[in-house]
UniProtKB/Swiss-Prot annotation:
This is Small ribosomal subunit protein uS8. Belongs to the universal ribosomal protein uS8 family. GO terms for molecular function: rRNA binding; structural constituent of ribosome. GO terms for biological process: translation. Disulfide bonds: none annotated.
Length: 130
């Protein structure tokens, strides 16, 4: 079966595993997904991720607070294959007045909304995470 939106599939797998309080989730590997996961780890939304050498799946360790509360409260795919959403550096939205993060695909790689504004680069708004 052909997957039309692999990023949405990854976000859905993370959302579903997060709601069920799973510690790990497997997603098919790609370079774009690895870049997105690196940003999520840097921003503190996931604990860790790794790609075993003999596997084509990324293992993502989800993060929870000490009292078992979810760190990721919500995930939303913004730009989709049928309707791409682009924004200039000035137009990149703030998620929940800065409490969340917008992932932006730019010429400098995958950046958060704040990093894109600082670098004065726009791009495709991939997703919101809060």
């Amino acid at each position: 079966m052909v997957m039309t939106d692999p990023i949405a599939d990854m976000l859905t797998r993370i959302r579903n595993a997060n709601q069920m309080s799973h510690l790990k989730v497997l997603v098919p590997a790609s370079k774009l997904k690895l870049e997105i996961l690196a940003v999520l780890k840097k921003e503190g939304f996931i604990k860790d991720f790794y790609l075993p050498q003999s596997s084509r799946e990324i293992i993502i360790s989800l993060k929870y607070s000490p009292n078992k509360e979810r760190v990721i409260k919500g995930l939303k795919r913004v730009s989709k294959p049928g309707l791409r959403v682009y924004a200039s550096a000035e137009q990149i939205p703030k998620v929940l007045n800065g409490l969340g993060v917008a992932l932006v695909s730019t010429s400098k790689g995958i950046l958060t909304d704040a990093q894109a504004r600082l670098s004065q680069v726009g791009g495709e708004v991939l997703a919101y995470i809060w």
